[in-house]
Amino acid sequence: MSDLKAYLAAKYMSGPKADAILARSSDPTLKKKRKKQQTNEDYIGGSVKAEASGGLMLRDEDEVWGRSKNEDEEDDAPVIGKDLATFKGSKSSWATVANKSALPLPQAEPTSPQDIKPDIKEEPDIDGPAASAPVQMTKRRGGLRTAAQLKEDTERELAEQRSPSPAEGEERPDPTETVHRDATGKIIDVKKRQEEERIREEEERRKEAERKEWTKGMVQRRDREERRRLEKKMAEADVGRSKDDVRMNKEMKEEERWNDPAAAFLTKKKKKGPRRPKYEGPWAPNRFGIAPGFRWDGVDRSNGFEKKYFQAQNTRARREYEHNQWSVEDM
């Protein structure tokens, strides 16, 4: 404890107080005498003693006055200098943990005020001196610090608590932006909600256009697409067309007209595309001219009504013919 007082007096104090501390630390023979605890000596000792009777012991005032004067003179004996003031000894509150630690602790070297510097967290230089990371000060655990340093650290901590710095690559939030919440308190992203609404409206418009196309019929849609394709080809083709134009002649031959007299004996165009299979072979006629399916095995499993119906028609037609022939036989 005396070494600490001597170090502080040598480095940070001046005047008679510092001189007294340095003188006491340099001379081991000088020790400060502690004052004896004052007690009420009026009841201790004196010319009259009553120990036998168990009463109080009295002491003369002259004897007490002289003894207290001598004690004061003895207490003032080691005083050196003028207006001397010393540190009051106090019990240290630091706990030694050297016995519990297996690693040796480094000894702290005394430093001057010029050598005291803030602790700076060193980071590796990745991209050179131009891209070095910003200096970050760590929290100090102890040591002497000036009022300016304490004020600066306090202001910096308060600023970090009020507005924490965003992570790298993230945009700083706008403090003036309005925050919307739902009934449960959850934050609503207005931009995301608007984007979802726009996508939903586009999907509804597309479905509405598809429903309108469904009502127009497949044939009309196919004709429209064919006309659009033809117009595109005509826009790319030459303006002049002669009678030897192969494409024009082919289109005119493939076109069907309801009042064409040669449509009955001309070769009809073959329709391309998938076709349903048909039954190959003879089959009994019916009133509606419906052909059997291609999986029919040729066995008639009906009740015979169609067959009787055609026989009755043929019989009536034959009788009418015979009646007409008989009626004109005499002519």
From Swiss-Prot:
Disordered: annotated segments: 23-48, 98-261
Any one GO molecular-function label of the UniProt entry: RNA binding
Coiled coil: 186-216
Record localization: Cytoplasm; Nucleus
Keywords in alphabetical order: Coiled coil, Cytoplasm, mRNA processing, mRNA splicing, Nucleus, Spliceosome
GO biological process: mRNA splicing, via spliceosome
Highest taxon in the source lineage: Eukaryota
Database matches in InterPro entries: Bud13, CWC26_splicing_factor
Pfam families to which the protein is assigned, alphabetical: Bud13 (PF09736)
Amino acid composition bias (Basic and acidic residues), ranges on this chain: 150-160, 169-259
UniProt main location, coarse: cytoplasm
GO cellular component: cytoplasm; RES complex; U2-type spliceosomal complex
Subunit composition and interactions: Associated with the spliceosome.
PANTHER family listed in its UniProt record: BUD13 HOMOLOG
Family the entry assigns: Belongs to the CWC26 family.
Known function: Involved in pre-mRNA splicing.
Listed name of the protein: Pre-mRNA-splicing factor CWC26
Lineage: Eukaryota, Fungi, Dikarya, Basidiomycota, Agaricomycotina
Gene this chain is encoded by: CWC26
